[in-house]
Amino acid sequence: MLLAKVYMLLATNPELQDASLSEMDYWNLAYTEAKDIYMSGDYSLESDYASLFDGTNENSDESIFELQISQDATNSQMARNYTPWRYKAGQAFGWFSVSASVYDYHVAHYPTDLRLDATYISDYTQRCGGCETEGNPHRTYPTNSSRGSFGNAHPYLFKHAEKDRTHTNQFNSQNLIIYRYADLLLMLAEISNELENGEELGYVTEVLERSGQIPHAGYLADKDSFRDAIMDEYRFELLGEGLDSYNNRRRGYAYFLENTINRHNNNPNFKASVDVLLNDVESEVMLLEIPLLEINNNELLND
């Protein structure tokens, strides 16, 4: 699956391609790698999207590669960092939320999407081990639409939160899925659209049916429209699962600028006091600098 992702990146970045291979060659290579996994029959979609993130359905038939997390091994503080503030009895910092513009864009496409409640949370009663605000409501956007401060202006990302509200440890035991079958289906939909092999709608329909949705108009127009729709679908399905940077950038700076940076910076609900203005300087947003320590010690790096 990882090799298919590499071929997809190469297909959309001519400066990285081997001179002997064309864009379509790379799409075909990606298709072969992804299709082999699909045809193996080893994986399938779980019926309940939320079960992928509640700790009760680990190493499921949908999981292709999954990190094994153990509270006793103290090998992950994901839950502490992602669990909303005072959502559980202790060690709930809620450092990571989702930009309100991302939530709004999702709801605009799929207002009845079954993925919404598993992905975002904005309304709950506080749990804090008996503190004075125990049981008080805590509401952020969109439940609290005022967006009066940064603390309530964006929904929390709920996928990686600890779901046991009595939990007090800074570590927990919820595994982290790196690659899953739904991602593979979206990849095959994107690849098939580029190859124009007629298979694209079938793959994305499998993913959408689980969420109670059907392909929207963007999937039914033309090749360019389908491309934009499937790139959005990665975000709706996989938000916060570690692939956002890769998917947002792999079609190049111009696509990233139009469909991520400008979409956020120019959205009608942008509020300077609580929204971050995204940097649009290509040299600063497309590449990560090589650390000086690596430059000084890795003799295999070119000058």
Protein language model annotation of sequence segments:
Residues P84-Y103:
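Short, cationic low-complexity segments
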Residues V98, H106-A108, D113:
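Hydrophobic helix-coil surface modules that form long, contiguous segments used
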Residues M78-R80, P84:
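Glycine-rich (often Gly-Gly/Gly-Pro-rich) flexible segments and glycine-rich loop motifs
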Residues M1-M78, L114, A118-D303:
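Acidic/polar-rich alpha-helix caps and helix-coil junctions
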